């Protein structure tokens, strides 16, 4: 028999439904994601640390879960909110139902609530703190108190929390339908050595770099510039990640060193914001952020529109860009800055997720541009 669950927002709004995960209490910033597929990749994206994810598509869990689609070693979202959980997970790759997957990692979840109403609240009032309570003895007053106690993501440095604790090599390319996940490539197939800062890196980002000939050394978020330079990299990659970029002073300072050395730098998501801060721009907390796989972004250089995958609650402030930074991409939803390029250094970044997972690959050529900068650096 299904257990009950409730979601309480900091403004006092209460949603009652059924539990689809573990028993317990979870608190975080409640956000909504408009992706129709890719729920497992979303849950395991470290960028969702300290966030409760609401999926707007009504049927979630149809294809179950499997070990190959995880973007990290664990679920990083604080909780999951959906409209309907199908009774049967049907897919030839399925290994476990979504409900069992949540329970196995002690993640709370709630279903059978009005996710359209919840999304409208978040869109109109902005992202709110919330509390999911699942199991017996549900207490609305306690849930509301816990939601109000949560400090919010502003000023929170989560990159160093979710980052790897030890450096490691990554040489595995992308999954294919015919062969699944491939074996690690030989060094002879990977001519470019790239150091990737792990602020919460998704595996598919690393795979797409390997696809383009990069031998990766993935390092912890707080690795010094001196330690990275000792590895003699051909380029430095700044990964995605959760939380506020401004407290990540260690990463901002290291990036400034790489810029001074004219080493190619490519940033995604949090890495984009780190490059902006290192170059003298400022960042802002967004009202409800961008979370989804259907966001139109205009490439200002080529004059074309890309459909992109997005997941961020902070953004670089275009009004603060110094003269040596030019805007390269803008959101067609709200006009926010989506990409920048240094005019005096081989460095650029993109706010969205060109690796998708889930989502379209319209922005994948950004990886190719990074390789072009590396080739010029090595020439």
Curated annotation (Swiss-Prot):
Keyword tags: Amino-acid biosynthesis, Arginine biosynthesis, ATP-binding, Glutamine amidotransferase, Ligase, Nucleotide-binding, Pyrimidine biosynthesis
Pathways involved: Amino-acid biosynthesis; L-arginine biosynthesis; carbamoyl phosphate from bicarbonate: step 1/1; Pyrimidine metabolism; UMP biosynthesis via de novo pathway; (S)-dihydroorotate from bicarbonate: step 1/3
Organism: Vibrio cholerae serotype O1 (strain ATCC 39315 / El Tor Inaba N16961)
Function statement: Small subunit of the glutamine-dependent carbamoyl phosphate synthetase (CPSase). CPSase catalyzes the formation of carbamoyl phosphate from the ammonia moiety of glutamine, carbonate, and phosphate donated by ATP, constituting the first step of 2 biosynthetic pathways, one leading to arginine and/or urea and the other to pyrimidine nucleotides. The small subunit (glutamine amidotransferase) binds and cleaves glutamine to supply the large subunit with the substrate ammonia.
Residue segments, region CPSase: 1-189
One GO BP annotation of this record: L-arginine biosynthetic process
Entry-linked PROSITE patterns: GATASE_TYPE_1
Reactions catalysed: hydrogencarbonate + L-glutamine + 2 ATP + H2O = carbamoyl phosphate + L-glutamate + 2 ADP + phosphate + 2 H(+)
Record protein name field: Carbamoyl phosphate synthase small chain
GO molecular function, one term: ATP binding
Family assignment from sequence similarity: Belongs to the CarA family.
Enzyme class: ligase
């Amino acid at each position: 028999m299904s257990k009950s669950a409730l979601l309480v927002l900091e403004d006092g709004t209460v949603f009652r439904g059924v539990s689809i995960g573990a028993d317990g209490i979870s608190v975080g910033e409640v956000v909504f994601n408009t992706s129709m597929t890719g729920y497992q990749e979303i849950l395991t994206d470290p960028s969702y640390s300290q966030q409760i994810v609401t999926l707007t598509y009504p049927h979630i869990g149809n294809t179950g879960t499997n070990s190959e689609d995880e973007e990290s070693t664990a679920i990083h979202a604080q909780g999951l909110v959906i409209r309907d959980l199908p009774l049967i997970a049907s897919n030839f790759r399925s290994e476990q139902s979504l409900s069992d997957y949540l329970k196995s990692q002690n993640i709370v979840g709630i279903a059978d609530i009005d996710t359209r109403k919840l999304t409208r609240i978040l869109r109109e009032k902005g992202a709110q703190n919330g509390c999911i309570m699942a199991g017996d003895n549900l207490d609305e007053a306690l849930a509301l108190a816990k939601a109000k106690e949560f400090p919010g993501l502003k000023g929170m440095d989560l990159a160093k929390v979710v980052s790897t604790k030890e450096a490691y090599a990554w040489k595995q390319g992308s999954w294919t339908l015919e062969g699944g996940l491939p074996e690690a490539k030989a060094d002879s197939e990977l001519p470019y050595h790239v150091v990737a800062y792990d602020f919460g890196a998704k595996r598919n980002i690393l795979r797409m770099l390997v696809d383009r000939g990069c031998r990766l050394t993935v390092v912890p978020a707080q690795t010094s510039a001196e330690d990275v330079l000792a590895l003699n990299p051909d380029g430095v990659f700044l990964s995605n990640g959760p939380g506020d970029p401004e407290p990540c002073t260690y990463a901002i300072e290291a990036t400034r060193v790489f810029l001074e050395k004219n080493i190619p730098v490519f940033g995604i998501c949090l890495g984009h914001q780190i490059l902006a801060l290192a170059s003298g721009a400022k960042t802002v907390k967004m009202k409800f952020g961008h979370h989804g796989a259907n966001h139109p972004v205009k490439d200002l250089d080529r004059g074309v529109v890309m459909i992109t995958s997005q997941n961020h609650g902070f953004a670089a402030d275009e009004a603060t860009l110094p003269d040596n930074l030019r805007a390269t991409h803008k959101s067609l939803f709200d006009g926010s800055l989506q990409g920048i390029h240094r005019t005096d250094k081989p460095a650029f970044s993109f706010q969205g997720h060109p690796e998708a997972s889930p989502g379209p690959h319209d922005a994948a050529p950004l990886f190719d541009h990074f390789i072009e900068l590396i080739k010029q650096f090595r020439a």
